[in-house]
Amino acid sequence: MQTTFTELMQQLFLKLGLNHQVNENDVYTFTFEVDGHIQVLIACYHQQWVQLFSELGADLPTNDNLFGEHWPAHVQGRLDGKPILWSQQSLVGLDIDEMQAWLERFIDDIEQRKEPQNTKFQPNSTSPILFI
């Protein structure tokens, strides 16, 4: 028997112990603190496609990477003039463990994109640097 979107979300939030809100359109929202806060929205389009969304912030550069390292891809785009990260995959065959892994990769991707560009690599005296 195929799991419905509502059942999948109930199982996910129960397993992760996360507080969440759900609106009248079955959009699930949760916020968590990681050097600030990140809000993730989870929705289901036509009961076929599970979608993840998160607003990234106004100071991020445009990213043209349409295909990511992992499937499902995480796409950086714009919605109402604001940079967002979104991803989607089919509800068919999506189980709780796959949903959790996908959500964790999505959150990791958000954190990496929100990290200030000048702090991504800072060589120090112990960093091996090749001089030619």
Swiss-Prot record:
Q: Keywords assigned by UniProt?
A: Chaperone, Plasmid
Which processes are annotated in GO (biological process)? protein secretion by the type III secretion system
**Entry-linked Pfam families:** CesT (PF05932)
The residues that cross the membrane are: none
Q: Does the keyword NADP apply?
A: no
Which InterPro entries does the record cross-reference, listed alphabetically? Answer: Tir_chaperone (IPR010261)
Tell me, in a sentence or two, what this protein's role is. Functions as a specific chaperone for YopT.
Description of how the protein assembles with itself and partners: Binds to YopT.
What is the recorded name of this protein?
Chaperone protein SycT
Species whose genome carries this gene? Yersinia pestis
Q: Which taxonomic lineage is given here? A: Bacteria, Pseudomonadati, Pseudomonadota, Gammaproteobacteria, Enterobacterales
